Design a protein with these regions (language model features):
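N-terminal nucleotide-binding beta1-loop-alpha1 segment
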Residues: 1-16
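Short phosphate-binding loop-to-helix
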Residues: 52-116
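Short beta-strand segments
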Residues: 7, 96-97, 125-126
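Conserved core of the sugar-phosphate nucleotidyltransferase
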Residues: 103-144
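Short glycine-enriched, charge-decorated loop/helix-capping segments at active-site entrances
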Residues: 18-24
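Short internal beta-strands
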Residues: 47-51
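A short, N-terminal amphipathic alpha-helix
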Residues: 28-45
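Short, high-confidence coil segments that cap the C-terminus of an alpha-helix
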Residues: 43, 90, 117-121
Length: 144
């Protein structure tokens, strides 16, 4: 199953709660990302991975019926991704960060299609910068 995992947190040293601040049409970054990911043909599940301590993201389960909220280790983002993927039996992870509200679902679908066609384990547009910052997408298979 192809799932998007969006890592989010409240504490940012430069701009606390930045992903929860209203930016476009009274929407915050995380809501915009969810709406854009919902347009993908390939994403079967959207998982928001937040630290255990986070309470400010709980409203998302009421606002969006098709998302899952996973709470994991605050200071180990990699473990949070892995634990969320394992918990929900994800086979292919689409890694998105919550401070990229302009993510393009058409680009995402094209990348997922290429990932499947090429049969690679990892596919990204941010190792060699091919798109502007904010369009970062990483796709990888989770082998157990």
């Amino acid at each position: 199953m192809i799932s998007a995992i969006v890592q989010a947190r409240e504490d940012s040293s430069r701009l606390p709660n930045k992903v929860l601040k209203k930016i476009i049409n009274k929407e915050n970054s995380i809501s915009l990302i969810i709406k854009r990911l919902n347009k993908s043909k390939y994403i079967k599940k959207i998982i928001i991975a937040v630290p255990h301590e986070s309470k400010k993201f709980d409203y998302l389960k009421k606002k969006f019926k098709n998302i899952e909220l996973f709470k994991g280790k605050k200071h180990n983002v990699l473990d949070r991704y892995y634990s969320a993927a394992s918990f929900f039996n994800v086979t292919t992870v689409v890694r998105i960060t919550s401070d990229c509200p302009l993510i393009d679902f058409r680009l995402l679908d094209k990348m997922i299609k290429n990932f499947k066609k090429l049969k690679v384990n990892y596919y990204s547009n941010c190792i060699t910068r091919t798109f502007p910052d904010g369009y970062d997408i990483e796709i990888f298979d989770l082998k157990k």
